[in-house]
């Protein structure tokens, strides 16, 4: 009986810790990726292909992405609009 109560308490405590502190605090070896590469960035605003992703024209998507990714970025089509997408470096 006591053993069942102890196991129940340990499981309950683990669930509470997961909810309160989140997974990144429970498993600190799993880091949060702060890289802008391989991601879309709608915050950059409207992306015009051939203009905003052109390195020679100093396009805003290209400028945003080249700061954190060595291969820059391009305007990627999502549904009916283009969004700035930074290329995957490597």
Swiss-Prot record:
GO biological process: one example: killing of cells of another organism
One of the record's GO cellular component terms: extracellular region
The protein, known as: Putative defensin-like protein 20
InterPro entries linked to this entry: Defensin-like_20-28
Family to which this protein belongs: Belongs to the DEFL family.
PANTHER family per the UniProt record, alphabetical: DEFENSIN-LIKE (DEFL) FAMILY PROTEIN-RELATED (PTHR34453:SF3)
Annotated signal sequence range: 1-22
Principal cellular location given in the protein's record: secreted
Places the protein is found: Secreted
Lineage: Eukaryota, Viridiplantae, Streptophyta, Embryophyta, Tracheophyta
Disulfides per UniProt: 37-88, 47-75, 61-84, 65-86
Keywords: Antimicrobial, Disulfide bond, Fungicide, Plant defense, Secreted, Signal
One family name in Pfam for this protein: Defensin_like
């Amino acid at each position: 009986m006591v053993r069942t109560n102890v196991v129940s308490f340990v499981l309950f405590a683990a669930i509470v810790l997961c909810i309160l502190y989140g997974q990144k605090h429970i498993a600190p070896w799993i880091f949060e990726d702060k890289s802008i590469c391989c991601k879309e960035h709608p915050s950059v605003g409207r992306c015009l292909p051939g203009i905003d992703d052109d390195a020679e024209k100093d396009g805003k998507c290209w400028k945003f992405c080249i700061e954190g990714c060595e291969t820059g970025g391009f305007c990627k089509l999502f549904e009916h609009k283009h969004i700035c997408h930074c290329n995957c470096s490597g």
